[in-house]
Amino acid sequence: MTTRRGRRALLIAGGVGLLALAAALVLNALRSNLVFFFSPTQVHAHEAPSSGSFRVGGLVRAGSVERAADGLTLRFVVTDTVREVPVAYTGLLPALFREGKGVVVAGTMGADGVFRATEVLAKHNENYMPPQAADALRQAGALPSATLQTEAR
């Protein structure tokens, strides 16, 4: 009876240990895949991580888009109307990418102060902007239009 009870306790303890290990691995994987959002003002205030990926959102400043000769490399400026972040991106842009329109870029900040984007997301209709970008523009006191819509949170 004691050996049977001992084996059962050992089996339960092993199962709990394996569950704890699996949970720790899943949480670690999720934490390493998190990408936080920051406005250009927050980036300049050093609230964004100095290393690692994050997102910057705002408006593409009018007149800031410069294309390289290869047709894929692009430089532009993301602004929240208070501060600006220069961005470099190599790749195909979304069809809705335009100067003066909302954009969210994901990537890392270079030592030279240029944000190296690995992904560019443009707003998908005339009155839409990602909620984080809209909040950042509201805090800056400038919204692109009075009819701005955001996703339900």
From Swiss-Prot:
Single GO BP term: cytochrome complex assembly
Keywords: Cell inner membrane, Cell membrane, Cytochrome c-type biogenesis, Heme, Iron, Membrane, Metal-binding, Signal-anchor, Transmembrane, Transmembrane helix
Entry-linked Gene3D superfamilies: Nucleic acid-binding proteins
One term under GO cellular component: plasma membrane
Compartments, as annotated in UniProt: Cell inner membrane
Residues at which heme binds: H124, Y128
Topology with respect to the bilayer: Single-pass type II membrane protein
Entries under Pfam families matching the protein: CcmE (PF03100)
Domain of life: Bacteria
GO molecular function, one term: heme binding
Keyword Ribosomal protein among record annotations: no
Cytoplasmic topological domain residue ranges: 1-8
Residue intervals annotated with topology Periplasmic: 30-153
Transmembrane segments: 9-29
Stated role: Heme chaperone required for the biogenesis of c-type cytochromes. Transiently binds heme delivered by CcmC and transfers the heme to apo-cytochromes in a process facilitated by CcmF and CcmH.
Family as reported in the entry's similarity comment: Belongs to the CcmE/CycJ family.
NCBIfam families linked: PRK13254.1-1, PRK13254.1-3, PRK13254.1-5
Protein name, entry field: Cytochrome c-type biogenesis protein CcmE
